[in-house]
């Protein structure tokens, strides 16, 4: 069965708490993850919360990568949604793991827009 896109939902636990609260670091991680998976970056937007936490999104020509962090509990929720044949969202995972350093993580892999051939 063919599909239009691939959507990875990531649960990242016991992450580096300083990384989770580092807005510039999150922006760099989003850029690195985008480049690693072969996507085309349109823009990155982030917001730093007070007293802690960062939300960010990399808008891609092929869709998006998003992150929401909770430094107080060492947790991050991420989505990597890509469309197209030349982009592989799994290739973004090492850049994410290198920056956030999760002790454990889960990934849910969803095929979007499945079509019967």
From Swiss-Prot:
Residue positions of the active site: 63, 68, 83
Gene3D superfamilies, from UniProt? 3.30.160.750, S-adenosylmethionine decarboxylase domain
Task: Kindly list the residues the record flags as site (Cleavage (non-hydrolytic)).
Answer: 62-63
Q: What Enzyme Commission number(s) apply to this enzyme?
A: 4.1.1.50
Family matches, as InterPro entries? AdoMetDC_C (IPR042286), AdoMetDC_fam_prok (IPR003826), AdoMetDC_N (IPR042284), S-AdoMet_deCO2ase_core (IPR016067), S-AdoMet_deCOase_pro-enz (IPR017716)
Query: Which of UniProt's keywords are assigned here?
Result: Autocatalytic cleavage, Decarboxylase, Lyase, Polyamine biosynthesis, Pyruvate, S-adenosyl-L-methionine, Schiff base, Spermidine biosynthesis, Zymogen
| Molecular function terms from GO | adenosylmethionine decarboxylase activity
**Does the keyword Lyase belong to this entry?**
yes
Per its UniProt record, the required cofactor names are: pyruvate
Q: Which residues cross the membrane?
A: none
The record's GO CC annotations read: cytosol
Q: How is the cofactor bound?
A: Binds 1 pyruvoyl group covalently per subunit.
Q: What happens to this protein after translation, modification-wise? A: Is synthesized initially as an inactive proenzyme. Formation of the active enzyme involves a self-maturation process in which the active site pyruvoyl group is generated from an internal serine residue via an autocatalytic post-translational modification. Two non-identical subunits are generated from the proenzyme in this reaction, and the pyruvate is formed at the N-terminus of the alpha chain, which is derived from the carboxyl end of the proenzyme.
Q: Which residues carry this modification: Pyruvic acid (Ser)?
A: 63
Pathway where this protein functions: Amine and polyamine biosynthesis; S-adenosylmethioninamine biosynthesis; S-adenosylmethioninamine from S-adenosyl-L-methionine: step 1/1
GO terms for biological process? spermidine biosynthetic process
**What is stated as this protein's family in its record?**
Belongs to the prokaryotic AdoMetDC family. Type 1 subfamily.
Q: Write out the function statement from the record.
A: Catalyzes the decarboxylation of S-adenosylmethionine to S-adenosylmethioninamine (dcAdoMet), the propylamine donor required for the synthesis of the polyamines spermine and spermidine from the diamine putrescine.
Q: What is this protein called?
A: S-adenosylmethionine decarboxylase proenzyme
Protein source organism: Methanococcus aeolicus (strain ATCC BAA-1280 / DSM 17508 / OCM 812 / Nankai-3)
Encoded by which gene? speH
């Amino acid at each position: 069965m063919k599909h239009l896109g691939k959507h990875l939902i990531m649960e990242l636990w016991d992450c580096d708490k300083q990384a989770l609260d580092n807005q510039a670091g999150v922006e760099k991680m989003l850029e690195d993850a985008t480049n690693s998976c072969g996507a085309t970056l349109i823009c990155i937007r982030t917001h730093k919360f007070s007293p802690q936490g960062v939300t960010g999104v990399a808008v891609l020509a092929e869709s998006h990568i998003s992150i929401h962090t909770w430094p107080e509990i060492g947790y991050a929720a991420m989505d990597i949604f890509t469309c197209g044949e030349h982009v592989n969202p799994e290739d973004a995972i090492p850049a994410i793991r290198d920056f956030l350093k999760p002790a454990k993580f889960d990934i849910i892999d969803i095929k979007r827009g499945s079509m019967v051939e």
